[in-house]
Amino acid sequence: MNYNSTQNAAEVVSAAQAIAQGISKDGGLFVPQSFPQYDEATLRALLKEDYKGRAKKVFSDFLTDFTAEEIDECVEQAYTAAKFGGANPAPMAYTKLGGKALNVLELWHGPTCAFKDMALQILPHLLTKSLKKTCDGKDAVILVATSGDTGKAALEGCKDVEHTKIIVFYPVDGVSPMQKHQMNTQEGKNVTVCAIKGNFDDAQTGVKKIFTTPAISEQLAQNNMLFSSANSINWGRLLPQIVYYISAYCDMVNDGKLAFGDKMNVVVPTGNFGNILASYYAAQMGLPINKFICASNANNVLTDFINTGVYDKNRQFFTTTSPSMDILVSSNLERLLYKLCGNDDAVTREWMTALKTGGKYEVTDAVKEEITDKFFGGFCDDAQTKDTISRLFKEDGYLCDTHTAVAVNVYEQYVEATGDTTPAVIVSTASPYKFSKAVLQAVAPDAALPETEFDMVDMLNQVSGMPVPAPLAGLRDKQARFSDVTEADAMPQYVLSALGIV
């Protein structure tokens, strides 16, 4: 199977090239030229597989230039019980709210306690194999812009992996204290972390600009290096996310929560659009999904887009209690638009150019109609998020983080608006302990909060009785290794300096 750019369909590459390169030279994103089709027999066979078996099937269908042995190696190295605390790295949890069942897909049992581990534990292995196939002898320089979770997960996945170097940029005031400490204490001889003065969109724009500046790429090439990305613009990041939607469906059927062949809804807290896009791609393969429910916080650019067909990033930016969704430019939406406009690269390029130059574009009526047919967009503010965490904990003792609470709240809005009783999978993207202050304020509103986030973790543990994940429990005593801060427009110079090129 080959891949082409969303902005130049003539730019065709293999899977290994797409993963190694990360982004197309024209600035477009790589997408599969077709989708494998999973019929009833295929899905029934996957019911009998464990998570690794399901992953191997999906990877083998998309990565046709990888051998079965190579895929086995990647999957076996990534999804170990030691890293994820059990044989199933993405277990279902069943709870209730308002007397109604909630089926929660918990994606935060990995080494950094966030859903990004599901992709970033395997991406470095896919990347090193891709480099051997396409760019023998070159080292990959992985640039990451993060709103919180991606940075730590990418650092952890890439640390000390041969022939890779990783540089992570995060907004200086746009991540939680826990996330900042996780990144700045990162171990590994091939890792660099730097804060930027600005928000996530500034960081992401800076990384994209570095990727698409030929002079910088030439300097790397002269030093036997090339750029790649661990953000969800990289196909190697997006592909592993398809797996857990298929696995969730199989687990729901096996657990008696869904009849085989019946449709389910998916509810995804959404920032950069990669996670919900993976569910859409799973549906393109034949997974029976009825509705894609896109949950946003106060930065509700996606809600407005789904409801109006107009994408407009020219609006106030809010710093919220769900910082991984504090995003106004959702990069992976480009892939959806390319699919919905009939794989028309010229139209996609026109919209993306309008976004870059004026911060706004409007899709055609036909695309708008398809989006409103398949997607539901809703948002909630910090007060609603807090209330949802509180209600869920009071009713069933289930503790969730702020991003998951946004998804639950928007799902309630959806059910109220539509009356749809289709079983839904709520995607839970982070451990509540990663956002202990906001969660504590919800479940123990009258308690005096301790000064440090680590003391808040201890207090949340006492209030909830939920065990503190081991990776977070051991973080308190780690010393920070990184403290650099740079201007957004100085990012190119910082990268070259960090690599020892200038």
What are these regions (language model features)?
Residues 1-502:
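PLP-dependent amino-acid enzyme catalytic core
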